[in-house]
Regions:
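Alpha/beta-hydrolase superfamily serine-hydrolase fold, recognizing
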Residues: 7, 57-59, 63-68, 72-255
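A glycine/proline-hinged amphipathic helix-loop "lid/cap" segment
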Residues: 1-73, 217-220
């Protein structure tokens, strides 16, 4: 365990981040509502920044949800990155996500498609998130060869980076797989009330004292938010039960 980690974990414990994940469904959604009311993206300001920095920013629509494309040139590049932000499926991206998207475009020469995917709430469940994310990838394959597309996701977005293609396999593989998937800190929200997952629940409780961020209780709360009373395919909630047949080279990062 590095000194940097020890310092960071101590700070996280002291500021009480973990307490937030003890909130119930209603409290968590109220918290998310407040976070999502903040203005984190202004299209006109973003376009002005693109002009100053000599690149192009395009605003698109995917099933009623915004998608912005960072491009070095007015015409599409040979390859692209689908950027899926993190936020537990309930909170919007932050300003660092946009800066990183810009940086990826500048350093790789690839276009970056940034999807504002549907967030889970009382009225929107995770199957809608998958539907829109899958459609965004389908649209990408109309512009770029699938092998020239990389899919990058963080946290809940990392779950989507895998889940889009678990979904593709589940519905008969209508789309070609991307060239690579980069999944940073993916998780899952298995049903810990069923017998086959009891061991997972016991391990979560056993490791709780080591986890400086998330209390095991949140697994149940997050599942309640994402699923509600809907009949949702289990792979959308717990990617470990999905079909990984013919997946491309996939990079996992944790920490």
């Amino acid at each position: 365990m590095s000194l940097t980690y020890k310092i960071a974990s101590t700070i996280v414990r002291l500021i009480g981040v973990k307490k937030m994940f003890l909130k119930n469904k209603e409290e968590m959604l109220e918290y998310a509502k407040g976070e999502n009311a903040k203005v984190v993206f202004d299209l006109e300001k973003a376009k002005a920044r693109a002009t100053r920095k000599n690149y192009y920013l395009f605003d698109m629509d995917v099933m009623g949800y915004r998608l912005i494309s960072y491009q070095k040139n007015q015409t599409p590049a040979d390859g692209a990155v689908l950027y899926l932000f993190g936020g537990g499926m309930i909170t919007q991206p932050n300003k660092l996500d946009f800066k990183l998207s810009e940086r990826i475009m500048e350093q790789t020469g690839k276009d970056v498609w940034f999807l504002f995917y549907p967030l889970c709430s009382e009225n929107v469940k995770i199957d809608k998130t998958y539907e829109v994310s899958f459609e965004a990838y389908r649209l990408m394959t109309e512009t770029y060869k699938a092998e020239n597309i990389s899919v990058l996701g963080f946290s809940s977005g990392a779950c989507l980076s895998l889940g889009i293609f678990l979904h593709n396999n589940a519905i008969g593989r209508p789309l070609s797989m991307p060239g690579k998937i980069i999944s940073v800190s993916p998780g899952g929200i298995p049903d810990v009330t069923v017998d086959e997952n009891k061991e997972i629940w016991e391990k979560l409780k056993e490791l709780n004292h080591k986890d400086v961020m998330i209390d095991p209780t949140y697994i149940k709360t997050a599942r309640e938010i994402a699923k509600g009373d809907e009949d949702i395919p289990e792979y959308m909630l717990d990617g470990t039960v999905g079909d990984f047949t013919d997946f491309p080279k996939t990079y996992f990062y944790f920490g």
